[in-house]
Amino acid sequence: MLAATVLTLALLGNAHACSKGTSHEAGIVCRITKPALLVLNHETAKVIQTAFQRASYPDITGEKAMMLLGQVKYGLHNIQISHLSIASSQVELVEAKSIDVSIQNVSVVFKGTLKYGYTTAWWLGIDQSIDFEIDSAIDLQINTQLTCDSGRVRTDAPDCYLSFHKLLLHLQGEREPGWIKQLFTNFISFTLKLVLKGQICKEINVISNIMADFVQTRAASILSDGDIGVDISLTGDPVITASYLESHHKGHFIYKNVSEDLPLPTFSPTLLGDSRMLYFWFSERVFHSLAKVAFQDGRLMLSLMGDEFKAVLETWGFNTNQEIFQEVVGGFPSQAQVTVHCLKMPKISCQNKGVVVNSSVMVKFLFPRPDQQHSVAYTFEEDIVTTVQASYSKKKLFLSLLDFQITPKTVSNLTESSSESVQSFLQSMITAVGIPEVMSRLEVVFTALMNSKGVSLFDIINPEIITRDGFLLLQMDFGFPEHLLVDFLQSLS
């Protein structure tokens, strides 16, 4: 449960210092609620089993003075686990303190070799080696604290308790006298309990931090593409309340390994609820940075050639057989070219009505003429304001165009005079086809990008994307991310 909690909590972290203040300054906030922890708790057994199996159990040696036998030297060697099962587990959040995990009835069978020796009254040395099994029943109590260490989530379990309900030593074949079994059962049980507690608690803590690093590395991959990445370093220690865990992240975009260290807005915990499993809060500054790096990387452009241009028009119900279209394309629609690109960085803001995008674009049409030696070029510069609402369903991102306004800036014909009817026709083409086509292509691009990063592997349930003045909120339920746990456990082997 501990590691599974970290699996979802740990978004990403690069090496930056953590603030120890109480204010919540962040570009991105992640909140995981109690219902999510209950889902993650279902897979406790796999993580605890891994901790038991990965733990190294040192040899236990000593000696004991026995009546008639003198000094008996003993050693338990090559201690390994041969069987493990877990009955149940529970998780509780302790306000401003820790995640408390209770694991009941862990049945573990250890095996190894018992070596002992003593000298008889006749000065005869006796040395024996016997295979053994230790049958144990254990309860675990793990109280885990989450901290920020150089911008990353770290875990620490200063309170880790093992309670033994059963600890029975079985010697191979029971060939030795009963006093041997009694000696080692009674005498070494205390030492064995201390060794097991120390090694198991240590390994649980190690695995938790390995998983935190694993998830943060995976998140770094999900949130990057080419020269673009995101700095989601923690801005402070994660917050624990009785109903949720919450982490606060910078959310600065990184372009070609350079990050803008902009002032962060202040986040109010009242902006998020606790009825859904998982919440993400994004400041509109995150989208402003996204627009900037996308513009710098040359991604805000579109080019359509020939038959593809005609097919796009027909997809949106544009009549390519009308006379004016044939006149404009000069009878060679298969050789027409259209390019669209942003003239400057778009401005993105979050409002109650949706995400508002202000952009200045240039649209250029190039149509060949019958002599194949000349072309007619039309160029439009326009300011476009679109209001968009996003949704996610069936592993796909959908963008709904709620409203748009187009303000023409300049229109030019680079080769010949053009009639107002031609300009009006091309303008209507931009409005009726251009904007919907760009929206459609963005849907495809973003969906493909998310799927390439493995987002489609997550069982996302009833996601909602909500815009408010100054921020965007994503809230959802989810099924256990089995694929992440499988990948993590395989990485340990």
From Swiss-Prot:
SUPFAM superfamilies for this protein: Bactericidal permeability-increasing protein, BPI
Phenotype when changing residue 313 to Q: Reduces cholesteryl ester transfer by 60%
Keyword terms, alphabetized: Atherosclerosis, Cholesterol metabolism, Disease variant, Disulfide bond, Glycoprotein, Lipid metabolism, Lipid transport, Secreted, Signal, Steroid metabolism, Sterol metabolism, Transport
Impact noted for substituting residue 215 to W: Reduces triglyceride transfer 10-fold. No effect on cholesteryl ester transfer
GO biological process, one term: positive regulation of phospholipid transport
Molecular function GO terms recorded: cholesterol binding; cholesterol transfer activity; lipid binding; phosphatidylcholine binding; phospholipid transporter activity; triglyceride binding
A Pfam match: LBP_BPI_CETP_C
SMART domains the record matches: BPI1 (SM00328), BPI2 (SM00329)
Keyword Secreted applies: yes
Main localization of the protein described in the UniProt heading: secreted
Signal peptide residues on this chain, from the entry's feature table: 1-17
Carbohydrate attachment residues: 105, 257, 358, 413
Compartments it resides in: Secreted
Tissue expr: Expressed by the liver and secreted in plasma.
Cysteines engaged in disulfide bonds, as pairs: 160-201
GO cellular component, one term: vesicle
Catalytic activities: cholesteryl (9Z-octadecenoate)(in) = cholesteryl (9Z-octadecenoate)(out); 1,2,3-tri-(9Z-octadecenoyl)-glycerol(in) = 1,2,3-tri-(9Z-octadecenoyl)-glycerol(out); cholesteryl (9Z,12Z)-octadecadienoate(in) = cholesteryl (9Z,12Z)-octadecadienoate(out)
Annotated PANTHER family: CHOLESTERYL ESTER TRANSFER PROTEIN
Family membership noted in the UniProt record: Belongs to the BPI/LBP/Plunc superfamily. BPI/LBP family.
Disease: Hyperalphalipoproteinemia 1: A condition characterized by high levels of high density lipoprotein (HDL) and increased HDL cholesterol levels.
Function: Involved in the transfer of neutral lipids, including cholesteryl ester and triglyceride, among lipoprotein particles. Allows the net movement of cholesteryl ester from high density lipoproteins/HDL to triglyceride-rich very low density lipoproteins/VLDL, and the equimolar transport of triglyceride from VLDL to HDL. Regulates the reverse cholesterol transport, by which excess cholesterol is removed from peripheral tissues and returned to the liver for elimination.
Protein name: Cholesteryl ester transfer protein
Organism: Homo sapiens (Human)
